[in-house]
Swiss-Prot record:
Keyword presence, Zinc: no
Alphabetized PANTHER family for the sequence: RIBONUCLEASE VAPC2 (PTHR33653:SF1)
Annotated Mg(2+) binding sites: D6
Protein known as: Ribonuclease VapC
Similarity annotation: Belongs to the PINc/VapC protein family.
One Pfam family hit: PIN
Function noted in UniProt: Toxic component of a type II toxin-antitoxin (TA) system. Has ssRNase activity. Its RNase activity is partially neutralized by cognate antitoxin VapB. Rapidly induces apoptosis upon microinjection into mouse fibroblasts (L929 line). Probably contributes to host cell death if bacterial cell lysis occurs during host infection.
Names of the cofactor(s): Mg(2+)
Domain PINc: 4-124
GO molecular-function terms, A-Z: metal ion binding; nuclease activity
UniProt keyword list: Hydrolase, Magnesium, Metal-binding, Nuclease, Toxin-antitoxin system
Length: 134
């Protein structure tokens, strides 16, 4: 069974707060283009060239760890359905999180995140988390 990994987990990995063992019980761990985009946005904010180089190296490492799932037509339909359902309930969640959730729901994979507060409000989404190291 697969697993979608959220950006919060990857940031915790970069900071040494979790290890890759966090998803080792799953056959395959995936990210979607939105997770990659969020990481790239962070790089654009880094002004120090050495730090920027380290960030780019880390992103290459992330790309080697995970399979990148596409965000296509089916995911777009699921995304629209999620937004409609949340709108009816007057629930607001960030667009990026909803796009990541749509990918997880489309593939029927749980999502591994540290942002359980938002993701648990999305129906049909199985949300998993891990404890952080000190």
């Amino acid at each position: 069974m697969g697993l979608i990994v959220d950006t919060s987990i990857i940031i915790a990995l970069e900071r040494g707060k979790i290890s890759t063992k966090a998803w080792s019980n799953y056959d395959q761990a995936y990210i979607n283009p939105i997770v990659l985009t969020e990481l790239l946005i962070g790089i654009d904010r880094v002004k120090d060239e050495n730090k920027r180089g380290q960030c780019l190296t880390f992103i290459e490492y992330v790309k080697s760890l995970f399979t990148l799932l596409p965000f296509g037509i089916e995911e777009a339909y699921v995304y629209a359905k999620i937004i409609d359902n949340l709108y009816k309930e007057r629930i607001t969640i960030g667009v990026h999180d909803l796009l990541i959730a749509a990918t997880a729901i489309t593939y029927n994979y749980p999502i591994l995140t540290l942002n359980t507060k938002d993701f648990k409000r999305i129906p049909e989404l199985e949300v998993l988390t891990v404890p952080l190291k000190d």
